[in-house]
Every structure is written in structure tokens, then in C-alpha cells.
Amino acid sequence: MGELIRLEKIGVEYQTRGHAPKKVLDALDLTIAAGEFIAVCGQTGCGKSTMLRLILGAEKPTAGRVLIDGQELPRPDRNRGYVPQKYSLFPDKTVLDNITFGPEMEEFGLLGRLTPRFRTRRREFRETAHKYLRQMGLQESDANKYPDQLSGGMQQRVAIAQALIMRPKILLMDEAFSALDPATRADMQKLVRTLWAETGTTILFVTHNIAEALYLGTRVVLLGKENPNASGRVIFELAVPDSARGASGYPRREEIERMTKLIEDAAMGGRLEVEMAEFAG
């Protein structure tokens, strides 16, 4: 696969009133090929979420360049989907309307929704939304429910469907499963990895959990800081080959132990979670 994303000497610095500028990322270099599943680990405050926002186009670097398909990063568009840790569904819209809102607004805006053509396209959008509902393991009866009638896991499935209906080339997921209970979290991991295998979408998934990263990723990228006052950068990368996985798709326990040791040694004392029993195959 060819190169899709390139981060070149990225620096991000925030100005704060009455304090010295806070540098979050410094000299960060990373290249990602089309179709990769990149799991991003690192201690709190090392710039993982900032990196996702840069790729999304929601934030600009202070230094360096973000390239998508060889082009300087444009504004956010449908080619980059985003699933945050706390899903942001519209509470006054049904599940179906939450999913179709993005493509409807992109194609028609507010005024365009008054045209006859919108009514035709809306039927098409809703048919597509039903397909993603099924793909996410939701029932047809869930389509007309409101977010507060759904469990946390079901709401997160809707949030992923919101992103997928835009058919992004790149899907950015920022600790998207961290608030879920272990059983739901495991279900969502399997679901997302299956979607990745079927669609070939390039995914960047931020997590604090090493075992989760090793299960999901084809490559684990560790961000870290040399000291508490330093800024984040890539300090370690590890490919996760298919040969390390058991029949279930999870890495075998001995492989998790081996790769976890490599990552922890590179983490320079940063706290990372390891919930091995839950993920080991």
C-alpha cells in the first residue's frame, strides 16, 4: 500500500496567558500507509489526541507539515471520520437522523433541505443508514429511538455509524471504547477490526491499554516524553504480525507478554494499562 499520511517534524505549542508557552508535540515524525490500522499508545499528556486533531484538520501545527495523499492538509472533509471518547449524538434526533445528518448537511446545507431533490436523496441516505445500523449490530427497531434510550455501547455504535456513512478513507478514534464495560468493549474491538478488514479503511486508534493496542493494530506507535516537562514525540514503533495472533485473532499470550515488555521498556516510566487476561488468545 502507498503512503497516505505523513507527519513531518510536527510541533504544537499552546499560548497561555501569564505562563510560558506549553509545547505539546515536538519534532514528531510519522508515516502511515493506506490500509494500516495504527494503535497509538502513550502516557497522559504526550499529545495523542492532539495528533488526531492535526490529521483531522481541526488544528494546525505550530511547526512542520501534515500531508494527506501528498497534499498539505486541507480543512476537515468527509475523507476523515472522527469518533471521540465521549460520543456527541444529538439528543433531540432519532438514531436514524443522527446518522444521516452528516451527509445531508454536506450535500444540501440548511436551505437545500427545502428542495424536492432533498426528499429523494433523503430516502437514499436513510437506506444507507439502515445498512450501517445492521453492520453495527443494532436492530431496525433502534432506528427511531433517541440516544437516551440506548446503552453506552449502543450509543458508541451509532457514533461509529455516523463516521462510516461518510465513507472516510481515514477513521480517527480517540479512546473510543474506554468508557465501556469490558464485555461491550471486547465486542466493539471485534466489530471495528472486522470493519477494517472488510473495508480497508485506514484507522488510527488511541488507547491507554497495551493489550487492546496489540489486538487492534497492525502497528503500535508509542508517543512519550523524555521528562515531565518535555513534549511528546514518537519514541517507539512495533509491527504486530499475523503470525503473532492465535485462531481468535487475538495475539497469543506469550506474544502479548513479549511485545508488552518491549513497549513498557520504551515507555520511559510512563504509566500504561495492561489488561492481559481480557484480550489474550
Predicted features along the sequence, with ranges:
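The feature captures the beta-strand-to-loop junction immediately N-terminal to the Walker
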Residues: 41-43
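Helix-to-loop junction immediately C-terminal to a conserved catalytic motif
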Residues: 56
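Conserved ABC transporter NBD signature motif
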Residues: 64-75
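Short helical segment in ABC ATPase nucleotide-binding domains corresponding to the A-loop/adjacent helical element
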Residues: 96-104, 112-116
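Conserved ABC ATPase "signature" region
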Residues: 112-141, 194
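Conserved ABC ATPase signature
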Residues: 146-150, 154
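A short, proline-enriched helix->beta-strand linker immediately N-terminal to the Walker B motif
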Residues: 165-169
